[in-house]
Amino acid sequence: MSDRIILCDVAPRDGIQNEKIMLSSAQKLELIRRLAAAGMRWIEVASFASPKWVPQMADAEEVFRAASQIPGIRPIVLVLNDRGYDRAVAAGARYIRLVVAATDTMNQKNANALPDATMAAYRPIFDRARRDGVELTGTIATSFGCPFEGAVDPDRVLRLAAQFVAAGVAEVDFADTVGMAVPPQIERMLVRARNEFPSVRIGIHLHNTRNLGLANAYAAVRAGADVLDASTGGAGGCPFAPKATGNIPMDDLVFMLEGMGIKTGVDLDKLVETSRWFEEILEHPLPAMLPKAGPCWNSPPPLA
């Protein structure tokens, strides 16, 4: 287990894409600025998806261009196809996530194609990214379970991961899209991924649908994950997956990691302030517990 881990806050993208209240560009940028001020360095700032399907992301270009001027952050974006890639690169994006679902039904819902067809459609993007100097991450949705098909064969997931690695991505992320995983699943998958793909970063994207998000994050850290996604306040959900609730709360995750002796570089007080502000903007409570209970120590407790 490393004493350091990369955290990526997905609140400005995954955290708001399902919200009924349409946030203004100014509000999205204020969220990103607050996260940066709290010490978040990797931030997923937008998705270049069709505004028809994800209207919350209609201002992706404006938000990205402004976010890219904030010092000290890595502004990451999500794209689903070559049109999204074109828009992202034209806006100046250099860190792009691609996503494919491990199951046929989920990928049909998300991309209107089977997983193999989506991977084939990504081939021109892989080639262009090398020429454009763009760093790619391959994200595999429903890696641990699917709301339509149930259990997912890990071999199927790792075959998709192998295709991403062969195409030259810098990172592979395994997503528990609807919170179906339990800690032993997480550990087994990530240990295999670490052994099979030593040349790339291994990331995990967790949802807390069944209240196992932090337990799964703990398992991921113990298994050697390099990158953990989370969302300030625990906001989020997938518009194409029924009953998908929020991401694991970044607030609670940072509290856990710091208590484990893992340095995050995040100012927890500022992050909690941001979470409370975010609740006001969204006009409903968020599931993070730390903003409600507060930290129980002023510095990380001794582990001995």
What are these regions (language model features)?
Residues 1-304:
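Catalytic cores and adjacent flexible loops of soluble metabolic enzymes
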